[in-house]
Amino acid sequence: MTHQTHAYHMVNPSPWPLTGALSALLMTSGLAMWFHFNSSMLLSLGMLTNLLTMYQWWRDIVREGTFQGHHTSIVQKGLRYGMVLFIISEIFFFAGFFWAFYHSSLAPTPELGGCWPPTGIHPLNPLEVPLLNTAVLLASGVSITWAHHSLMEGNRVQMLQALLITITLGLYFTLLQASEYFETSFTISDGVYGSTFFMATGFHGLHVIIGSTFLTVCFFRQLSFHFTSNHHFGFEAAAWYWHFVDVVWLFLYVSIYWWGSYSFSIDPMQLTSN
């Protein structure tokens, strides 16, 4: 091994970008086969190889940063920029769902009955399970901040307690969201309301599951003493991601659950005259 005279991480050759690309190809091809031929075998294979690739790739990153010392302050700065750009891309991802919802609801077409929610759709009560979900996620935002401050102060026990509370609240939110889906009187195939509702809330639920997994990994890493008060970007990235999930839910609650549940109609004569 040659002597390194700079603070940058020169990565070693890795098979994971190639296996990740191949698994993504299998997943997208498998998704098309599932839609058209009702066969989920290729999709399952793609998901399995993708999960294995992610596990082994992130395992190598943990080894490089925690045990080999490659994540210097300059490298961590680059990782922070990368995480910020990733969250920005996620913002635009969800912006598409909000755009579709408001485009359809602010000027409902005659096919929808000229009203919103569309004729025949009975929206969920925003003051029941959605409000409880909001309280759960806001509480999880408080507990993850508590965990972060405890880590900064070197209080390992409180950090683990707060992190476990956050993970539990994330699991509780997921269970509430799943129970809510079973109670809805509409499905994803019930026009534009059903498709935008389930796409937006479903992808948010997927992000909650991903964030909970991220935090669970951080919990076990903290049990193994991987984090210190000045070297914990893995946890910091998970906390940023969780706060992003919180903020997206607030927009979802206000837009889709609260504002979108109030009925209003448009006079068809006004549409034709304009």
UniProtKB/Swiss-Prot annotation:
Keywords, ordered alphabetically: Membrane, Mitochondrion, Mitochondrion inner membrane, Translocase, Transmembrane, Transmembrane helix
GO cellular component, one term: mitochondrial inner membrane
Entry-linked PROSITE patterns: COX3
Keyword set includes Transmembrane: yes
Compartment(s) where it occurs, according to its Swiss-Prot or TrEMBL record: Mitochondrion inner membrane
Positions on the Mitochondrial intermembrane side per record topology: 35-40, 106-128, 184-190, 257-274
Quaternary structure, from the entry: Component of the cytochrome c oxidase (complex IV, CIV), a multisubunit enzyme composed of 14 subunits. The complex is composed of a catalytic core of 3 subunits MT-CO1, MT-CO2 and MT-CO3, encoded in the mitochondrial DNA, and 11 supernumerary subunits COX4I, COX5A, COX5B, COX6A, COX6B, COX6C, COX7A, COX7B, COX7C, COX8 and NDUFA4, which are encoded in the nuclear genome.
Protein name from the UniProt record: Cytochrome c oxidase subunit 3
